[in-house]
């Protein structure tokens, strides 16, 4: 087992001899790297990155931010590989003390799905994660949202017009003459600007096929607060790494693809509550991420936080031809419904994590063809619904009752093909032709329910991914058939699906913003799995959100995913093994919580710079997971207890040791709970395979 001689060595950091810059957490992420450090009295800091053939490349000053006494840099646009970051203090205009991280492993984004069909790469970045040649990068903050400018081509002769504000710049792009790739980088908490269109940023590129636009956030705290994003008449658009909350626009959606869009990729965003709308189903806001009249779309690695209506797909297309979309590796975290709710489209829905969903998972209507592949369902009430048949009309008993049931849609049905999905907990699901199936998690015979499952079914389940759905399988209402788009090589793209369990672990680790974002919330599964009501403490916290201070956002102590810590809690047999794999962490990876936290966290900086005991200073994190050594280190004074709990709530380990060996745990995602002096801290970790 590797040993660490200093706290900084365990963190994967090295300080230059005699330097005053004290580094905290640093790591690689998806095509980005980050570092935090304590202020040493410098006026500012320059940051340089090296790696992948580059040496001492200075990053933009806007990427270096100060949060109280803590500084942070996030460096986007890095190709997958190994890098170091060098932090240099600047005093009176002169560079001085510096510190350099150890090697940070940067991973590539998963560019899979229909948005990448036909050789397209949406946005201002190349397929390798670096900016496209000639790309213009503009930084948008709360103070610059109305004043940022860009000279944009606004005529066929190349006449340039100086356009002001981020919406003003996009309005100039609408004329369709500007071909320069544009990257709008949002920094921090940004509220409504003066130039929004009915409360939304509108990306309308005038149907140009040569404009490439990325709208992204920098770091874990980039937040769109109070306004939404609307996309129409646009191609080659990417939206990523944004937290979107408290939307109060006229349209009401966090992000909405409205019409005439192609090759759009929305990924790694956090979707929170919006303001309540006028309809009774809009108490949590309207749609989180909706799409209609658009094709060649990918929505991936997004985190949906208790949204009421997550993904409406389709509205008035009127045809089943030519509309293609992919949903993969999204975390439907206690969101209620529409994951997605599909009209007309051919939709590939794979490797998503359905985590405690009170109403339903995916739903198919109006002749849509939905391929549900290797998704993980935990306590999702109705994992799959086909309108006007199966569970949709039998949900309340043994009599087919489309009048009183059929609340999902009342529209004619489509068809769902299902392969490799995992179900657990309380759920109801009726496969095509099944003699028995699960009702609220209990095996039930079709005969006892009086159901002909060749007519009334939720999905057609196959044993091989490439099995075609025969044309004899039709929806009960509308006699619609599956179009087998997923086995048509002229339509389908190349991709690699994880098994369902591995997908869940990857989703938990990577969905949402960098490091999971700055806003943290832990749901109470015993309440929130079955509830579609507004979580009022969560709502209050979102309304009160004013931006990040460099520390974690605390979770109320009443919220917890953990099982009881009493001796009666179930304990897993640690001798069992698993063949599933998880996304590996860097060998220098560490996750920590401070003594002021009560949630899973964004790692904070450590003020330690020499070989000291973690418990010797209250400034050091109270709990630290060192992935390379597969151990926890506890740094609180006095007595304490540590519980390690699986994602399903099973406690697998309890300890009062200051160093807790986790090498005996099988690979997977765990929640660690530290209880001391009447307070509780939580940390979510990924334990990789040996």
What are these regions (language model features)?
Residues 19-42, 95-108:
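Pro/Thr/Ser/Gly-rich low-complexity, intrinsically disordered linker/stalk tracts
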Residues 42-63:
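Extracellular low-complexity, O-glycosylation-prone stalks/linkers
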Residues 75-94:
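Beta-strand-rich modules
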Residues 109-120, 127, 134-138, 143-145, ...:
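Long, ordered, amphipathic alpha-helical scaffolds
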Residues 163-180, 195-214, 223-240, 246-261:
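Extracellular beta-strand-rich solenoid/capping regions of secreted or surface-exposed proteins
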Residues 196-203, 225-229, 248-258, 278-291, ...:
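Extracellular beta-strand/beta-solenoid scaffold signature
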Residues 211-221, 235-246, 261-277, 287-288, ...:
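Right-handed parallel beta-helix
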Residues 574-576, 584-586, 590-690:
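C-terminal outer-membrane/trafficking sorting elements
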């Amino acid at each position: 087992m590797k040993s660490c001689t200093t706290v900084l060595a365990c963190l994967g950091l090295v300080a230059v001899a005699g330097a005053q810059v004290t580094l905290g957490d640093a790591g690689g992420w998806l095509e980005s790297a980050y570092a935090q450090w304590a202020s040493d009295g410098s006026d500012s800091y320059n940051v340089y990155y090296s790696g992948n053939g580059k040496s001492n490349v200075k990053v933009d000053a806007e990427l270096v931010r100060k949060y109280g006494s803590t500084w942070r840099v996030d460096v986007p646009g890095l190709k997958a590989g190994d890098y170091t970051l060098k932090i240099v203090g600047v005093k009176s205009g002169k560079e001085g003390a510096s510190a350099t991280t150890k090697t940070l492993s940067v991973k590539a984004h998963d560019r899979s799905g229909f948005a990448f069909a036909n050789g397209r790469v949406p946005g201002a970045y190349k397929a390798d994660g670096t900016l496209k040649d000639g790309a213009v990068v503009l930084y948008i903050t709360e103070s610059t949202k109305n004043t940022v400018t860009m000279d944009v081509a606004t005529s066929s002769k190349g006449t340039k017009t100086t356009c002001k504000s981020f919406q003003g710049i996009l309005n100039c792009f609408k004329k369709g003459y500007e071909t320069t790739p544009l990257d709008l980088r949002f920094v921090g908490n940004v509220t409504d600007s003066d130039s929004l269109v009915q409360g939304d940023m509108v990306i309308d590129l005038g149907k140009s096929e040569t404009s490439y636009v990325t709208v992204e956030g920098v770091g874990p705290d980039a937040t769109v607060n109070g306004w939404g994003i609307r996309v129409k008449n646009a191609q080659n658009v990417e939206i990523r790494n944004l937290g979107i909350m408290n939307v109060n626009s006229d349209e009401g959606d966090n992000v909405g693809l409205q019409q005439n869009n192609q090759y759009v990729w929305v990924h790694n965003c956090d979707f929170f509550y919006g303001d309540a709308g006028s309809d009774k189903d809009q108490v949590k806001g309207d749609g989180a991420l909706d799409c209609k009249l658009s094709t060649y779309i990918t929505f991936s690695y997004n985190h949906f936080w208790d949204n009421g209506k997550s993904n409406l797909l389709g509205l008035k297309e009127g045809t089943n031809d030519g509309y293609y979309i992919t949903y993969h590796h999204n975390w439907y975290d206690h969101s209620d419904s529409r994951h997605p709710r599909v009209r007309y489209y051919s939709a590939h829905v794979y490797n998503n994590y359905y985590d405690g969903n009170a109403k339903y998972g995916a739903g198919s209507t109006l002749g849509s063809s939905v391929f549900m592949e290797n998704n993980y369902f935990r306590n999702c009430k109705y994992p799959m619904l086909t309108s006007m048949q199966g569970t949709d009309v039998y949900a309340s008993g043994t009599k087919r009752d489309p009048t009183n049931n059929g609340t999902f849609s009342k529209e004619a049905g489509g068809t769902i093909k299902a392969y490799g999905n995992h179900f657990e907990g309380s759920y109801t699901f009726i496969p095509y032709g099944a003699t028995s199936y699960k009702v609220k998690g209990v095996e039930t015979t079709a005969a006892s329910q009086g159901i002909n499952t060749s007519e009334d079914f939720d999905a057609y389940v196959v044993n091989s991914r490439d099995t075609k759905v025969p044309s004899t399988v039709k929806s009960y209402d509308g006699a619609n058939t599956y179009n087998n788009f997923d086995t048509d090589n002229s339509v389908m793209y190349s991709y690699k699906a994880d098994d369902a369990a591995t997908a869940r672990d990857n989703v938990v680790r990577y969905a949402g913003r960098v490091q999971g974002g700055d806003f943290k919330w832990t749901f109470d599964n015993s309440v929130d799995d079955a509830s579609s009501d507004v979580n009022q403490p969560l709502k209050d916290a979102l309304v009160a959100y004013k931006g990040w201070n460099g520390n974690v956002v605390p979770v109320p102590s009443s919220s917890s995913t953990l099982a009881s810590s009493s001796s009666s809690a179930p304990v897993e047999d640690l001798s069992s093994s698993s063949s599933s794999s998880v996304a590996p962490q860097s060998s220098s990876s560490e996750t920590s919580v401070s003594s002021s936290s009560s949630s899973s966290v964004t790692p904070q900086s450590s003020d330690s710079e020499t070989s000291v005991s973690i418990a010797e200073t209250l400034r050091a994190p109270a709990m630290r997971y060192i992935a390379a050594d597969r151990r926890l280190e506890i740094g609180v004074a006095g007595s304490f207890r540590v519980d390690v709990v699986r994602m399903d709530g099973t406690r697998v380990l309890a300890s009062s040791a200051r160093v807790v060996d986790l090498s005996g745990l099988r690979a997977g995602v765990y929640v660690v709970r530290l209880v001391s002096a009447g307070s509780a801290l939580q940390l979510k970790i990924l334990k990789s395979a040996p």
